[in-house]
Amino acid sequence: MALEAGDMEEGQLSDSDSDMTVVPSDRPLQMAKVLGGGGAACAPVSNYRTVKHVDSSEESLDSDDDCSLWKRKRQKCHSPPPKPEPFPFGQSGQKPALNGGKKVNNIWGAVLQEQNQDAVATELGILGMEGTIDRSRQSETYNYLLAKKLAKKESQEYTKELDKDLDEYMHGDKKPGSKEEENGQGHLKRKRPVRDRLGNRVEMNYKGRYDITEEDSPEKVADEIAFRLQEPKKDLIARVVTILGNKKAIELLMETAEVEQNGGLFIMNGSRRRTPGGVFLNLLKNTPSISEEQIKDIFYIENQKEYENKKAARKRRTQLLGKKMKEAIKSLNFQEDDDTSRETFASDTNEALASLDEAQEGPGETKLDAEDAIEVDHPQDLDIF
């Protein structure tokens, strides 16, 4: 056995497994203690390495040298030299925690902001709206859905007020916006564009439904002229045909068609173009062959209605002034020796109360004075007033 061991070279193992006994080596543990930190890294490897147990002291010394040489080679191969670290391990381990903390704070900040916006939306009553709001701009997020809803609601309310004022004007002979003027809020609303107030421009129908001649009846001629002019006031056109005759009315219709084809006419202030009916009536007033008496007869009913509206508005203003004066007098306390102030206020109060009595009696005289006569530029001016 010793001879076989002597014949083998250093570091060579025997092929027979029966002669070997696997025992842990005690010497490497002692070497690890002597070497200190450098041998501590090789201590676990010594348990894995197996050596052959022999009785000869020389063989044991050779095996010890082989083991130490192998350990040194093993350490060089598998233990790379330590690299200098720029930062300690403890600091590098704390950085992810800080980064993670910022991310968590950002998430909770976004959640808190979203909850605040949802709370505001709940208070405003917009839970039923469609779609979602883009919150990418965070605090600068614009709730366009709420803006559209509020704009639509305001538009509907404004339309209802206009319809109500129109009904009062048509049925009660009241001007639109009279309530606003009484409350002192008439100047708060912005003037609407012309297209919203008057609608789309009315175009003249040049061909018409059928041809008209002087021999046709006045009713047929008036109906066809009103149709071609797209004029809603057919009674006014009928009076024109009745007073001027079929021939003159047809001539005015032809002149109106020519003016409309050339671009139309502007109203007096130049803010918009006249309607075909307005052009027809303007030509009627500016025709030398038509007398002033005929023009007054044609527009008598419109002028009378306009005069009554102005008179009613004047009475309403006087009545409102009388009420304010009456309330002011009730709020004042006069002394017994202040006779001058009593007489002054009494005279003013009597005039105001007299105007109140006149307003309560009902509609006044309907006779049109010569100096109050009004010439209408075109029929739609009556509705705009």
Swiss-Prot record:
Ranges of compositional bias, category Acidic residues: 1-18
Residue numbers covered by motif Nuclear export signal: 120-129
Region named Sufficient for poly U RNA-binding: 219-319
UniProt-annotated location(s): Nucleus; Nucleus, Nucleoplasm; Nucleus, Cajal body; Cytoplasm
Highest taxon of source: Eukaryota
Modified residues (N-acetylalanine): 2
Main localization of the protein described in the UniProt heading: nucleus
UniProt keyword Transport present: yes
Phosphothreonine PTM sites in chain numbering: 287
Compositional bias per record (Polar residues), positions renumbered to this chain: 343-352
GO biological process: protein transport; RNA stabilization; snRNA export from nucleus
Tissue distribution of the protein: Expressed in dorsal root ganglia and sensory neuron cell bodies.
InterPro entries on file: PHAX, PHAX_RNA-binding_domain, PHAX_RNA-binding_sf
Protein family (similarity comment): Belongs to the PHAX family.
Function summary: A phosphoprotein adapter involved in the XPO1-mediated U snRNA export from the nucleus. Bridge components required for U snRNA export, the cap binding complex (CBC)-bound snRNA on the one hand and the GTPase Ran in its active GTP-bound form together with the export receptor XPO1 on the other. Its phosphorylation in the nucleus is required for U snRNA export complex assembly and export, while its dephosphorylation in the cytoplasm causes export complex disassembly. It is recycled back to the nucleus via the importin alpha/beta heterodimeric import receptor.
Protein name: Phosphorylated adapter RNA export protein
Organism whose genome encodes this protein: Rattus norvegicus
Originating gene: Phax
